[in-house]
Each structure stands twice: as structure tokens, then as C-alpha cells.
Amino acid sequence: MQYEIVSAGEDVDDERARGRRAAAPAAPSSAVPSSAALSSAALSSAAQPTGAPPATAAARRGRDLPRERLLARGPAALSDAELVALLLGSGLPGHDVFALAHTLLARFGSLRALLDAAPDDFKGLRGIGPARTAILVAVVELARRALAEKARERPLVDSPGAVDDYLRLLIGTRPREVFVCLFLDARHRLVQTEETAHGSLTRMAVYPREIVRRALALNAAALIVAHNHPSGAVRPSAADRRLTRVLRDALALVDIKLIDHFVVGASDTFSFAQAGWI
């Protein structure tokens, strides 16, 4: 498009004359395009590969979407909120899925707390209905089962890191104390994991006799036990040490070995065996 610049002092009659000339039909021009026009056309042609359709705005945005970046660069390239957004799938009217993901993380305080939430914890949250609740809960359960499967493949005493990861995912962020038994076979491979006691923030009743009875029923040769401290502090209490001694001695009467007792927090664990207390 061409623009005509009119100076402030230009004669009005000249303006009318130009108007009459503009109204007359213009003769076809055979003028050769200017060098500037040719250069502009050449640059425009060079910017677009021959035969390729022009890149659309949607295509350019697609390169920046989390799904595309995950497939191209791996999941480590995404933030916590972006990974949660992929699970949620879509947002709400006026709020995109990324805003919803950030809201969820802020509501629960951390990614671990979000993924450890029970189905009832999502009730009343705008944008999180039964379908999305099921997806979030299922993802964590799949991770737990994968770690348990890994624990069954080799002796647990040979892979303490796998035990730590499994226990932190299992009970590390529970809001109440939970006592867990990992029943092992003669080769110290995982046979079964069971929660044998539940308590409050500071108190829990554990019955060694019931644990021994269950170990015999599963034909277990050894046990690893664990409980969480909701406070996050993993230093064992005097009651924890006393329970460990009682349980170790009760299992020894039926020739079952207590290999370790873990105290589990959200980001750390304490091993009685490593401390030399078993």
C-alpha cells in the first residue's frame, strides 16, 4: 500500500486538482518494478522454502506445548505444573489447564502431597471431578506397584535405595502414623506388603503377636518393618527402639529374622540396621 503525505501549507487548489486526476481511470502501467520492490519480493520468497506451506501460529505454539516438549526432550524437561497439566488434560472456562495445575499444587503444598492425596481430598475442588481424581490416584498406585515389582526381582538387602524409595512413596507423606510390614522369602525377596497398624499424629498401637502370626501365614523367612513420622523428623523415639527389640525377639522365637526397621519421612528415612540397633 502507498501513502500520500500532505504538507500543512499545500494549496487547496492543488488538492482539488489531485482529486480530479485520481478520479480519472488510470492507464495500465508498464513500468518496471523498483529495485526495492524486487528485493522485498526476493526476501519474502527466500524466507519460505519452496513447496512448504507457511508456518501457522498454531504450529509455532505447538512446538512450545508440554506434550511436544516431553516427546522431543523427555519428561525431565517439564516442570511439575506442566506434568500435572498433562494428566488433567484440559482446563476450565476462563482458566487454562496450567492455571488449574498451579492451583492444585498450591492447594496441597507440594507435588508429593498432591500425589499422596486420597480421593476424598479432591472433593469440592473446582475442576477436579471423579474422572480426574481417578487419574491422579491411579498414577501414584502405578508407581507404587512398579516399585514393589522391582523389589520382588532381587533381594531387598542388596538394594537399600529401592526400599527407601518404595517406603517414602508408600507412607512418607501420610497425615497419620502407619506401620507397614514387608514380608520376605528365604532369598529376601518381597512376598507381600501389608499395613498392620494405623494411628494418630503421635500415637499408634502395634501388636507383635499379630505380626508374627501373619508372617507364619505367609511363610515369610524375614521381615522389614517401617512406620512414618508425620512431623517429618525421622529420629526414632525411645518407644520405637523398645518396639523394635520386642518385635525382633518375638520373630526370633519362630526362626524369622527382622532385617530392619525404617522410620520414614517425606524426604528422608532412618534405618535401625545401619545405625547398628538390630
UniProtKB/Swiss-Prot annotation:
InterPro entries: MPN, RadC_JAB, RuvA_2-like, UPF0758, UPF0758_CS, UPF0758_N. Residues 1-64 are annotated as: Disordered. Residues 156-278 form the MPN domain. It comes from the Bacteria. It holds the Pfam family RadC. GO terms for molecular function: metal ion binding; metallopeptidase activity. The keyword Methyltransferase does not apply. One of its GO terms (biological process) is proteolysis. A motif (JAMM motif) lies at residues 227-240. Keywords: Hydrolase, Metal-binding, Metalloprotease, Protease, Zinc. The keyword Metal-binding applies. Residues 22-59 have a biased composition (Low complexity). Zn(2+) binds at residues 227, 229, 240. Gene3D superfamilies: 5' to 3' exonuclease, C-terminal subdomain, Cytidine Deaminase, domain 2. Belongs to the UPF0758 family. This is UPF0758 protein BMA2230.
